[in-house]
Amino acid sequence: MKSLLPISSLLVLLGSASVSAADLNIPMSFEYLALDGKKVESSVFNHKSSLELAPGTHKVAIRYHEMVEDDFSDSQTFVKSSPFIVTLEVDGDHQYYLQAAEGKVVKKPKVFAQNPQVVLTRADKGQVNYQVTNTNIEEESFVSRLFSGNQAVDVSGTAATATGVAVAATPAPTSAQVAVSATATTSPTDASKATGANPQQMLQYWWLQADEKTRKEFMSWAISQL
């Protein structure tokens, strides 16, 4: 019986520590790149929807990416923004949510990617102290880096460096935006040209043609190859 009190006290302490962290949640159309100077392991094949944040000020690099209908064909193409950095002041075990300023549905993804406007809210409707700064860092697509031998810009690494630099900025309830440039990949080739296309184009083409089940199976295989 003498050991019950210390063990109970320890459990209380552990329980208190476990609930002290907050979570930052993002939609599928956004991707984490870095947190406080460190890369975040995430990709189009393995989306990370939340980050655990301890109390204090954090810098998170995020990017918007979406698949949209091509203007000149019946196929689809990818559009993505340059990274933007969210400086967030965490003051408790809150659930934070990031979304586009216009709402859950982005009506014009290509326009949005050129200058992403986002807002952060809390599940308890409390005030959120944060600041958003856009960058003009660009990167080749995941597929391009997977199949090409050239030296692509490491956006995650650059973003990690950016989030690791201390910035004297006063967090504000609203976001401050800077112009951002978007990078859209070339439209996938059609079936008649797929045979003569490079590996990147072929993979992109068949990905767009596959159904949901096939995509999930491919994602599982691709992750196992990384």
UniProtKB/Swiss-Prot annotation:
**Which keywords belong to this entry?**
Signal
Signal peptide extent: 1-21
Q: Which PANTHER family match?
A: UPF0319 PROTEIN YCCT
* One Pfam family it belongs to: DUF2057
Designated name of the protein: UPF0319 protein SO_1816
Similarity comment: Belongs to the UPF0319 family.
| Keyword Signal among record annotations | yes
Protein species of origin: Shewanella oneidensis (strain ATCC 700550 / JCM 31522 / CIP 106686 / LMG 19005 / NCIMB 14063 / MR-1)
